Amino acid sequence: MLTTTKVFFLLLTTWITWYAIVNPQSRAAPTLETIASLDLNNPTTYLSFITNIRTKVADKTEQCTIQKISKTFTQRYSYIDLIVSSTQKITLAIDMADLYVLGYSDIANNKGRAFFFKDVTEAVANNFFPGATGTNRIKLTFTGSYGDLEKNGGLRKDNPLGIFRLENSIVNIYGKAGDVKKQAKFFLLAIQMVSEAARFKYISDKIPSEKYEEVTVDEYMTALENNWAKLSTAVYNSKPSTTTATKCQLATSPVTISPWIFKTVEEIKLVMGLLKSS
């Protein structure tokens, strides 16, 4: 026969289990590392910010003398901070395995708030931003694909990249009611100036170090952004070589992603910051 104490603990355990099922956000989220922070008032630190990101996600070994994203992480998810001031900071939710941005957090009405792309599952979202709870955890109506972002925020070529542009996009959304167009514009800038810049030296080198300067996203940049996997695969599939600087030779040459034509691994290395994990 169950004692009163045993009955109590049985009921308590049952309630805790039920509560965790119907309130998944109540489960403790892991403590995630902030792998890099960018102070938008100090734009000269931008390239070191990008270098820090590459260092955090890079494998210990290289492929054809090119850094590559690691296959394994102690923690797969992390944060990256974009700082406007002591009272305005956007924190990006990052998947370390590919540097995908999954969402962001800010403060609204003195409470933590988080937005996630439409295609981010609840199981993944629950790893991030434990300070944002209940109705302050919001699923966006669009995904993180460039197709969705450009549909809602304008074409990449019409959204120049620059430190002030990024700062202004944060000011436009921080603590304010969700606005699809403004949020999509923010993501277009943040994804290209953080994730794509870490993936491609060509892009990171294009971002001006002066706060009020900007660069138009041209067809060379979008071609790289749309073909990271293709270029990475070409490097992984290359053959050993004793005559090239990278010790590698493309198995199939050239690799064409219009308007780019890459005839050697060395040419790919010139634009690449990180290879996609194999």
UniProtKB/Swiss-Prot annotation:
Alphabetized InterPro entries for the sequence: Ribosome-inact_prot_sf, Ribosome_inactivat_1/2, Ribosome_inactivat_prot, Ribosome_inactivat_prot_CS, Ribosome_inactivat_prot_sub1, Ribosome_inactivat_prot_sub2
Keywords: Antiviral defense, Disulfide bond, Hydrolase, Plant defense, Protein synthesis inhibitor, Signal, Toxin
Residues the record marks as active site: 196
Gene Ontology biological process: defense response to virus; negative regulation of translation
Signal peptide: 1-28
Entry GO MF terms: rRNA N-glycosylase activity; toxin activity
Annotated Pfam families: RIP (PF00161)
Reactions mediated catalytically: Endohydrolysis of the N-glycosidic bond at one specific adenosine on the 28S rRNA
Disulfide bonds, paired cysteine numbers: 64-248
EC code(s) of this entry: 3.2.2.22
UniProt cross-references to PANTHER family, sorted A to Z: PTHR33453, RIBOSOME-INACTIVATING PROTEIN
Family membership: Belongs to the ribosome-inactivating protein family. Type 1 RIP subfamily.
The protein's role, per its UniProt record: Inhibits viral infection of plants, and protein synthesis in vitro.
Name this polypeptide is given: Antiviral protein MAP
Biological source species: Mirabilis jalapa
